[in-house]
Amino acid sequence: MLRRLVGSEMCIRDSRNSDPSDIAVTAAGGLVGEVVQIWRPRELNTHETEWGFSCMSYEISGALGIKMANPDKEVIAFIGDGSYLLYNSDIYSSVITDTKLIIIVCDNGGHAVINRLQLFKGGKEFNCLFESSNTKKLVGVNFAKHAESMGAKSEEVSSIEELEEAFKRAKKSKVTYVISIKTHSYQWLEGSAYWESPTLELPKTKENKEALKLHKDCLLYTSDAADDALRV
């Protein structure tokens, strides 16, 4: 069985193989945290992350606008399969306007970062991953062929080594190039910060009690750290 990659592995390799002027774009899901920690900008204005409202699918349309403003630079959009399925028609826009993009689709089987948040907060999986949702027939999407149907060049890869070679081909391409790769649904980048979002009060399961304790401990730590900073 194919080992599903963690998104950070992919970001590391793409960052290493990019040029200093390349612009990385991301917006929603786990990729925001992973790209911010892993991608290494070497010039000003080469990293665009949509924070605030976690605007799903901004990745492609945002990358299109950035490329229009920077026609001589490579623009690389990192997007999850969930965001891709919500809105992807600007791939077609990029093709018909001759506005070349590189798009990396990380296929982790749904809205995996919210599924991880559900579990992290003491809950259970609920309608985030396609395989654990109320589906009658699970159909895998071929993102490479879908992008190809809109005029882009595309390929699906299954390893970091294949990704590196595909990325080189994408850089040489004159038209929008989409690379699809399967990534892990549950594993996450090790280094991270606490995500302060509400924790379930009910039901009083073992997982829920542990999540509540962690939430309160982190809030107390944050409050004490803020007080210490004010006293300095």
Label every model-predicted segment.
Residues S8-E9, R13-G30:
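Active-site pocket-lining segments that scaffold enzyme catalytic pockets across diverse folds
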Residues M1-I12, Y221-V232:
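Single conserved hydrophobic/aromatic residue that forms the stacking wall/gate
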Residues R3-R4, R16-N17, R40, M68:
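Generic structural signal for beta-strand residues in well-ordered domains
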Residues G7, A27, D81, S180, ...:
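Acidic active-site catalytic centers that drive phospho-/nucleotidyl reactions
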Residues R16, S21, E207, A226-D227:
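Intrinsic-disorder/low-complexity regions
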Residues E34, I38-S223:
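Thiamine diphosphate
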